[in-house]
Every structure is written in C-alpha cells, then in structure tokens.
C-alpha cells in the first residue's frame, strides 16, 4: 500500500556551516579547531567545501525548483564572534542576514542551528564544553543571535551533542582527538545540555518569537540476542551513552535512577567521575517543558553483544567495508546480524530503527511536543555520468525511511518534517569529499551543481506527499 505524509509536512535539505561554506578565514571569520586538525590529521581540508558562502543563491534557487521547502543552516559561531566572545564581526552578521533573506525570497524556511561541531578555536583550546566558562560564552552568543536575527523562526541550540562528546573523547576522530575517556564524554554531554537549557530558558523568558529545540543523533540500540540478558544489558548501556543520558536531560530535567546506575557502572569500570551541580539541575529542570521540538538525526542502528575485554574502536573513514571495530570495556561490542545491509562505511541500514526511536521518544518523553527528522540520508561514492548521478540506492534508502515516518505518524507520533542530509554534496568530517550525500552533485573543482536522480524523485514526493 502506498504511504503518504501530511499536507503541511516539511521536505527539507540539511547543511552545516563548516561542511558547506568554505571561506574559512574570509571576512573576519575566526579559526576553529578543525582548521589545523584537518591539516595535521586528514587528507583534506574544509576549503572550498561546497563554497556555500558564495553559492548559496544557486543552492536556494535549486531548492525552490526541486520542492525543498526547508533548509537546515548553521551559523558559524566564529563568523559572529571570531574568538567566541567579545568583539562582534559585522561582516559575519551581514552574511547571515543576506543568507536568511535569500531563503525567504525562495520560500525555503531556514531552521538555524547555533552550534554544529565548530566551537571557535580560542574556546576549544581552553577545554571546549568541559570548561564551564564556555557555557556562559555560548549563552551570550545565543542571546546575540536571538536578538539580531529576528527573521529566523526556528532555532536549534546544538547539533548532535552525543557525537560531539563521542568524536572528541571516545572515538577520538574530532579535535582534540582523545580516545576512550568515558568521563569526559558524559561531562561534555552534560555541560552542553546545561548550555542548551539555559539558552532555551533565555529565549522563552525574553519573549522572542519563533520556536526553539535541539537536534540529537539517536541511533537505535538492540541486543544481538534478545534472549540473552547480558546482550540486553550491553544494549541498555550503549543506549545510555548515546541516547538516554541526553534525552533525560532534555525532557526530564534530570537523569533517571536507571540512567545514573548505568553511568556509574560505566565510570566504575573505566575510571573518572562527573561534576554534576545543583544549579545544573535547576537549569535543566527549568527548560524541560520549554522545547518546542526535537530534531532527530537518524542514519543507522546498532546491535550490541556482551563482551569482556578492553576498549578498542577503529573508525572506518575511507569506505573500506568491514574495517570498523567498536567495543567498550564494561559495556559491550557492536555485532550486526549477517542479514542486515551495511554501507561501505559500515553504517547499518535499518529503517525500522527510526520508527522504534520515534515511538520510544513518544512513550518515554511525552512532553516532546513535536519531532522533525533533521538528518537522514545515504553516503555513497557517487558515480557522475551524463551530468547526473543515478542514485537508486539513495532513493530506496530515503523512501524506506519516509515510509516508517508515515507509519509513526499513523501510530500517533507528531512528526512535522524531514530534512535529507544533505542538500548538496558537502565534505564529511572524518571521511572527506569521497563520501557524498547530496540531492545535488557538486563538482568540487568547478563548484557546479547537478541534480541527481534522487532530486527529481524527492521533488515529486514533496509535491504530492505520496511516497512512491
């Protein structure tokens, strides 16, 4: 049976400042930790990325032509405050005003994120969000943006608090490249959630118009053997690290006893302790019912198996299928069922996981109000033929995920939109330019855009709300 989506559903495309803009030192932009980190550790940099800094009129015109009526954009904090605080950079402010004006001219609603992995270098090298002073700096930056950019109707504080802590302190593929420090992971999650809560409270107390929420990456975690209590426990602990800890902070304003039991177990095994203060919980509690929406980024699920051994994580950054490894001491290891498909980067394709995650939020956090799927898509080594890409695999992936969103809506979940990652090809943080996600193919040499087969398919779905 053909499935449909509501008439007012947003069919969006997603971008991020650092992955799309290029112009990393242009017009007064301050440095971010990624600038040097990519030069030192990877085979690519963020120049020119998709040159969105100059080419956004082209991308927004294409959006309008292809039925994309929402766009996720992030503001580069260091374009506004080059050192994260103090002096404002007027050229950065002007750029975003021009960008948002173009969005509205093209009838593409901007959903604007304040922080998408790109803390200014001056603050990042001072501990990033492990340093509590940076909570204040973030709230001040947020307040400036709320006041300045009154044309924005949808704000999100952070993109993917979970993967930031994960990338910086567990996997070690984000600057500062620390591995296996679970205490830092949880502390980063916590301090960023306090920053989020304080920004949301300020937004509401100040009476700004528009809506505000947060974007969480929520990969669903399953036990490898649902009948084995040890595998069930491994999945629960992995879920706490990546999902439950930050969801509790968002919607309960505290960490449930079950969540803290898991956190304490993980830290007991791996070492370290957390600094959780009364004023933190006051801030979390004050904001827990003020979020207008939750953004869910969903790409994959994981299966967890009980495991007794040391932590070892190997990141597959080059698309060499089967080269990744993930096992955490006292938690478990990832082991997927053989019949579940994977991408070349070992990302597990499992649309049912998105349905399960949406329904979990609905059941466990009934004050969620509404959900946008703020990222979902398929990374490929696209083959450019006849000025396009025949990306049937991507179409199939997105179709199946839209279908489970339709199912979730039918089953009572309030899901209001979908943003495909990514609008146009951008560079991938730890995979470079080879891993493409866009509706529009970007020739990174010439910066020309070419609609892929998926763009024509997406346009039809957006126009008809029929998933076929």
From Swiss-Prot:
The active site is at 160 (proton donor), 375 (nucleophile). Signal peptide: none annotated. Its EC number is 3.2.1.85. It comes from Streptococcus pyogenes serotype M28 (strain MGAS6180). One of its GO terms (biological process) is lactose catabolic process via tagatose-6-phosphate. The gene is lacG. Pfam families: Glyco_hydro_1. It is an enzyme of class 3 (hydrolase). It catalyses: a 6-phospho-beta-D-galactoside + H2O = D-galactose 6-phosphate + an alcohol. Pathway: Carbohydrate metabolism; lactose degradation; D-galactose 6-phosphate and beta-D-glucose from lactose 6-phosphate: step 1/1. GO terms for cellular component: cytosol. Keywords: Glycosidase, Hydrolase. This is 6-phospho-beta-galactosidase. Belongs to the glycosyl hydrolase 1 family. D-galactose 6-phosphate binds at residues 19, 116, 159-160, 297, 428-429, 435, 437. GO terms for molecular function: 6-phospho-beta-galactosidase activity; beta-glucosidase activity.
């Amino acid at each position: 049976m053909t499935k449909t989506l509501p008439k007012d559903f947003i069919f969006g495309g997603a971008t991020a400042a650092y992955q799309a803009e290029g112009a990393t030192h242009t017009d007064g932009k301050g440095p971010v930790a990624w600038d040097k980190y990519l030069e030192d550790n990877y085979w690519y940099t963020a120049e020119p990325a998709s040159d969105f800094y100059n080419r956004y009129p082209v991308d927004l015109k294409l959006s309008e032509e292809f039925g994309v009526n929402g766009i996720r954009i992030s503001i580069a904090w260091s374009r506004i405050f080059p050192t994260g605080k103090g002096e404002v950079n007027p050229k950065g402010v002007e750029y975003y005003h021009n960008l948002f004006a173009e969005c509205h001219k093209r009838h593409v609603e901007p959903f604007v994120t304040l922080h998408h992995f790109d803390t200014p270098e001056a603050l990042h090298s001072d501990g990033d969000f492990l340093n509590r002073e940076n909570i204040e700096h973030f709230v001040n930056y947020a307040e400036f943006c709320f006041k300045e950019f009154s044309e924005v109707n949808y704000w999100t504080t952070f993109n993917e608090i979970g993967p930031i802590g994960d990338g910086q302190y567990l996997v070690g593929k984000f600057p500062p490249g620390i591995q296996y420090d679970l205490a830092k992971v949880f502390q980063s999650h916590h301090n960023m959630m306090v920053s989020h809560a304080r920004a949301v409270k300020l937004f509401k107390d100040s009476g700004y118009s528009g809506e505000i929420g947060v974007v969480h990456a929520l990969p669903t975690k399953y036990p490898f053997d649902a009948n084995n209590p040890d595998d069930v426990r491994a999945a629960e602990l992995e879920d706490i690290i990546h999902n439950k800890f930050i969801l509790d902070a968002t919607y309960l304003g505290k960490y449930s006893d079950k969540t803290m039991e898991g956190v304490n177990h993980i830290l007991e095994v791996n070492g370290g302790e957390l600094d959780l203060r009364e004023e933190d919980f006051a801030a979390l509690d004050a904001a827990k019912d003020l979020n207008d929406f939750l953004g869910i980024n969903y790409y994959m699920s994981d299966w967890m198996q009980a495991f007794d051994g040391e932590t070892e994580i190997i990141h597959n950054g080059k698309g060499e299928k089967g080269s990744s490894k993930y096992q955490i001491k006292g938690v478990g290891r990832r082991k997927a069922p053989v019949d579940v498909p994977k991408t070349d980067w070992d990302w597990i394709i499992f649309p049912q996981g998105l349905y399960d995650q949406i329904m979990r939020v609905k059941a466990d956090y009934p004050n969620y109000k509404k959900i946008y799927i703020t990222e979902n898509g398929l990374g490929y080594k696209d083959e450019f033929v006849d000025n396009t890409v025949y990306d049937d695999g991507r179409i199939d992936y997105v179709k199946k995920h839209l279908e489970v969103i339709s199912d979730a809506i039918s089953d009572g979940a309030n899901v209001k939109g979908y943003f495909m990652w990514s609008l146009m090809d951008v560079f991938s943080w730890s995979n470079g330019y080879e891993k493409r996600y866009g509706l529009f193919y970007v020739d990174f040499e010439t910066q020309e855009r070419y609609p892929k087969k998926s763009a024509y398919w997406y346009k039809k779905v957006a126009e008809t709300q029929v998933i076929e």
